[in-house]
A protein has these predicted regions:
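Extracellular carbohydrate-recognition regions
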Residues: 1-25
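Short, exposed beta-strand/loop patches in secreted or surface proteins that constitute
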Residues: 20-32, 196
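Hydrophobic residues embedded in beta-strands of well-ordered beta-sheets
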Residues: 34-37, 203
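Secretory/extracellular carbohydrate-interaction modules
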Residues: 38-167
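Ligand-recognition surfaces built from glycine- and aromatic
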Residues: 69-73, 80-83, 221-270
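Short tryptophan-centered beta-strand motifs in secreted/extracellular beta-sheet-rich domains
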Residues: 72-74, 190-198, 203-205
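A mid-sequence, solvent-exposed acidic-amphipathic segment
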Residues: 155-191
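Short strand-turn-strand beta-turns centered on an Asx-Gly dipeptide
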Residues: 206-211
């Protein structure tokens, strides 16, 4: 499918002024001359640390810049493998529902992205996929068909603590929330080209498609826009399960860890 590039960032020079830098705590950006490293070193569980760029700070959600159809391409690698990298990290599009950068009221999540979370994070929203790890993922909890679920959320969560009821009750809820997930089939410490196509109805994810053309490793329902772009590495963990377990906290990160990016492109699709 032909595409028209809107953003092409190669990180060989200074960071484009279109990006907001969000650097808090022990988070830092380190240009190498040909790449950009998003670094967290010496983070404490007493303070949030984040190295991030985005394009939505200061905007109301209705003015977030991205809607389908589009394609995101990112070439990246991480300093540590899954399970040894601490906190959360990734890149893609979301509606900033938890207002980590401030200025808006909380809301329910919409996202389409490559997302990493280390233990003790547990966001097991797909029965076939672990609650942490390096994933491709989609969610749209603001779909009209999903909103009535709020009235039955508590009793449903209690019932789903029984495995047999979880297997019966969760699949239609997962469908209503447009939840799709799959582990990324690659070593995250190696350089890879990550591609997602966000269509009106479907979201598709590839890894290194230029090396070995193949079907997407995840083909999932697409969330709606508008959403903002984000690329980050931080020291938080999150817990949200169908059984009603919720939690949030911060992790100590003593050793240096990073997400390194050397290419980022966002292109409109016809």
């Amino acid at each position: 499918m032909d595409a028209a590039s809107i953003i092409c960032e190669e990180f060989a020079t200074s960071l484009s002024p279109r990006w907001n830098r969000y650097l808090v705590g022990a988070g830092a950006l380190e240009p190498t001359g040909s790449t950009m490293r998003f670094v967290v070193t010496g983070a404490s569980r007493r303070r949030y640390s984040d190295a991030q760029i985005d394009d939505y700070q200061g905007l109301p959600r209705r003015r977030f810049p991205w809607r389908p159809p589009l394609r995101l391409t990112v070439r990246a690698r991480f300093s540590h493998p899954s399970g040894e990298l601490h906190g959360t990290a990734g890149f893609g599009f979301w509606n900033d529902p938890f207002v980590m950068s401030g200025g808006r009221l909380p809301t329910l999540p919409r996202a389409i992205w490559f997302f990493y979370a280390s233990p003790p994070s547990n966001m097991k929203l797909d029965p076939e996929v672990p609650g942490h790890g390096w994933k491709a993922a989609t969610i749209d909890a603001l779909r009209p068909v999903a909103l009535p679920l709020g009235f039955v959320a508590l009793p449903a969560a209690l019932l789903m603590n029984a495995p047999s009821l979880y297997r019966r009750l969760w699949p239609p809820i997962q469908h209503a929330l447009n939840v799709g997930e799959a582990l990324v089939p690659a070593d995250m410490t190696d350089w890879h080209t990550y591609v997602l196509e966000w269509g009106q109805k479907r979201a598709r994810f590839w890894i290194d498609p230029e090396e070995a053309p193949s079907p997407p490793f995840l083909d999932a329902p697409a969330p709606r826009g508008p959403q903002g772009f984000v690329l980050w590495l931080d020291n938080q963990y999150l817990v949200a399960t169908p059984q009603g377990r919720f939690g949030w906290g911060l992790l100590n990160i003593e050793k240096r860890q990073w997400l390194e990016v050397d290419y980022l492109e966002i292109a409109r699709l016809p």
